[in-house]
């Protein structure tokens, strides 16, 4: 019996030793959100108390615009992903748009929600509650990746509030053969993914971003640091993991019910959500336009911000 137990004990001891080494080398504590606010909540950032959270948002441009542009970011991202696009649109004297963007629950400086609910209906309700607080009655809603999925679901739930939709590499259809980022792959693995609560080295974020961006020159030290630090914001890692654990497939049949004019923007080299999905959206949404960006990855608003900003402006002004 003792001889039979020895290999098992040896394996367990080796596993524990590896864990100890990993924790001693790579384990990182959460960063207090108040500390991160000093760096990432500069003007025009504001905070809105909503649903037990302090929602980080920015409201820029023409305050009299009757139909603001709402921008939603993707998983493990933040409102900062739209910085360059917003700057171009707001600075255009011909475009008198109001642009509102915010950190979704689980991400950025908004952080986790008290209910620990990250299902699709929760996000739809959150967006509606946020827009109601700002007294937004009509809007154009735009989103990337997770944010894109939230955008079209919100448009279906509240068609009277949405004039137009803009989808950038959006979720919606079952994923097939995509490579996915290293971070997302680990987050999807049962049991092992719990290590991400403590071990999220900057090198992992860099490796993931190198999958997200087609042009690796965009994976700068500043960009890696931003994604890494905001992931480490207190509670965000646990919230992100909860999101992955609770994630359920969307119903692509619902997409055919979208009536609003829709602009579909896609990076042709997207390794997370294949460009094939862009053509599915185009096929299923009757009143839609498709804009494919060659040599661009999963987040075109960062990698090809000039073309994205111009496409958005042209679409809104139609």
List each language-model region with its residue ranges.
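Alpha/beta-hydrolase fold catalytic core
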Residues: 1-67, 94-97, 137, 317-318
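Conserved alpha/beta-hydrolase catalytic His-Asp/Glu region
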Residues: 35-38, 178-180, 198-257
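Active-site loop/oxyanion-hole signature of alpha/beta-hydrolase fold enzymes
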Residues: 51, 58-60, 101-142, 310
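Conserved HGGG/HGGXW glycine-rich cap/lid loop of the alpha/beta-hydrolase fold
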Residues: 62-109
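Flexible "cap/lid" loop of the alpha/beta hydrolase fold
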Residues: 156, 165-194
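Short beta-strand/loop motif that positions the catalytic acidic residue
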Residues: 258, 264-266
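Acidic catalytic loop of the alpha/beta-hydrolase fold
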Residues: 269-273
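Catalytic active-site module of serine/aspartate enzymes centered on a nucleophile-bearing elbow/loop
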Residues: 288-289, 293-318
């Amino acid at each position: 019996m003792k001889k039979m137990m020895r290999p098992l004990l040896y394996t367990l001891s080796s596993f524990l030793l590896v864990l100890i080494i990993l924790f001693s080398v790579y384990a990182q504590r959460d960063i207090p959100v108040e500390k991160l606010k000093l760096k990432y909540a500069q003007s025009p950032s504001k905070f809105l108390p909503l649903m037990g959270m302090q929602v980080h948002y920015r409201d820029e441009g023409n305050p009299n615009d009757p139909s603001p542009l709402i921008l939603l970011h993707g998983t493990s991202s933040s409102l900062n992903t739209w910085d360059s696009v917003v700057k171009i649109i707001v600075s255009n004297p011909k475009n008198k748009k109001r642009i509102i963007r915010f950190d979704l629950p689980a991400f950025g400086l908004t952080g986790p929600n008290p209910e620990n609910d990250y299902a699709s209906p929760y996000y739809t309700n959150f967006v509606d509650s946020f827009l109601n607080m700002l007294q937004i009655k009509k809007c154009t809603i735009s989103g990337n990746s997770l944010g894109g999925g939230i955008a079209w679901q919100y448009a279906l739930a509240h068609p009277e509030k949405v004039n137009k939709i803009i989808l950038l590499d959006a979720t919606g259809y079952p994923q097939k053969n995509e490579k996915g980022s290293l971070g997302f792959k680990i987050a999807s693995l049962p049991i092992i993914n719990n290590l991400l609560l403590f071990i999220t080295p900057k090198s992992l974020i860099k490796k993931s971003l190198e999958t997200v961006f087609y042009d690796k020159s965009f994976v700068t030290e500043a960009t890696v640091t931003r994604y890494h630090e905001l992931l480490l914001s207190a509670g965000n890692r646990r919230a992100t993991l909860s999101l992955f654990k609770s994630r359920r497939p969307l119903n692509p049949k619902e997409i055919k019910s979208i009536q609003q004019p829709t602009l579909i923007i896609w990076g042709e080299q997207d390794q997370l959500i294949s460009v094939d999905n862009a053509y599915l959206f185009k096929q299923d949404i009757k009143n839609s336009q498709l804009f494919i960006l060659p040599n661009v990855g999963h987040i075109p608003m960062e990698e090809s911000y000039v073309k994205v900003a111009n496409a958005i402006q042209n679409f809104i002004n139609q």
